[in-house]
Amino acid sequence: MVLAAVAGVGLTLAGSPGASARVATRTATVTKPCGGEALAPKPGGGAWACTFDDEFSGTTLNRSWWVPQVTATSAFTTGPIGSEACYVDSPSNISVSGGALHLTARKEASPFTCSWFTTQYTAGMVSTYTGFNQTYGRFEVRALLPQTTVAGLQETLWLWPVNDTLYGPWPGSGEVDFSEFYSLYSYLDIPYIHYNYSSTTVNAATHTNTVTAYNCQIALSQYSAYAVVWTPGSFTITINGKTCLIDNYVPNGGLTSPAPFNQPFFIALTQALGIGANAFNPATTPLPATTSVDYVRVWK
């Protein structure tokens, strides 16, 4: 989850879900095709099979699949020092209604102590840390982003490795931010794929180690479908079916593709407060701010 797009500063998950996590492979019980969505054949041929599908059609979070992120037990936070977001398991921050999951950042009535810091801000995040993970496949999330063009808000739809120290400290084991929104650049989605590589190997013509893109335009007022197709050695990210980024990854540090992306990853959905050029400003950034998720679908 990149919190400063220009600087490329990354933030890892800590605790549960988080650093040095060890989770057995989890599969979801899917009783219908993924939303009835028809897909083109898989790269290399064959048909996609639905492995996970949450349409958020009820009124409560399916906790057999999703676990809320809680700062008190994980130390995970976003936002600038002095205005950090405390992630809490509260219906004010995480709710399901109207056919969507809603993740909200908000200002509380008064300051409170959250883990090691004092803040007045809370936010919502969920992941399939204990409910579902998969190696390779197609992951798609349809989401509506916060409706603001003022700096300070961030949304991330991402994949995180089950064993996040398998290939050393972050970003050695990889991270896939297949959708990343900064409200300062409200017309763009800026995906980012994290791993160790040599900058001398980047080749736009062959899509070698092209880890990010700055030309993926979005319509802020509409739901968009953000998808990533992950195969051994490559990622293809699309927005509403239009290709946004292709990365044929070639890691360094003694690794050979498909490492480090050759283990299960789980899904994380985050409403965040920004830092850096997109820093949250209590005086100007509008709150509450919500990312609404229409569905999460996965195929293999």
Regions found by a protein language model. Name each.
Residues 28-300:
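GH16 jelly-roll
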Residues 1-22:
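Secretory targeting and sorting signals
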Residues 22, 26-28:
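Proteolytic processing junctions in secreted/extracellular precursors
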